[in-house]
Amino acid sequence: MTGEVQAKVALATKAELRAAVETAKAAQPAWAATNPQRRVRVLMKFLELVARANDAMAELLAREHGKTIPDAKGDILRGVEVVEFALGIPHLMKGEFTEGAGPGIDLYSMRQPLGVVAGITPFNFPAMIPLWKLAPAIACGNAFILKPSERDPSVPMRIAELFLKAGLP
């Protein structure tokens, strides 16, 4: 904790935000049409990449945020646990059917992606909260725009890079 600047990241302009929304809108239909099992494979690959990058991410988080290394690893682990939960989302996406809900009435529900969703995350858990928001949304077929805290954006940006490497469009 030296107080030294660790990195400088420019704030997004309104035009950049609009471009991000338009890009997400354009990508979302194809992602939603990707079957849930294939979407989950991206999460599985992401977990593999995070496991390899865990120590470096914890060190980055500790330098930028001021957490201890064990606390930083815990922040990442709690986020990873939600990604692991999201691996089961294909089962949850099946919907329901009720035959004979009333005379001549059958009921069914279908679960569908919402579209473009966003996560605005706080500074105090820069790995955990983005993963809590991002993984379920992605597994369900949504496009996701992440707005990390300007106080410690490096780990959320690294998470985004790892998702790209894992195959997220």
Q: What spans do the regions from the language model cover?
A:
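Glycine-rich loop-to-alpha-helix module at the N-terminal edge of alpha/beta enzyme cores
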Residues: 3-93
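Rossmann-like NAD(P) dinucleotide-binding subdomain of oxidoreductase/dehydrogenase enzymes
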Residues: 95-169
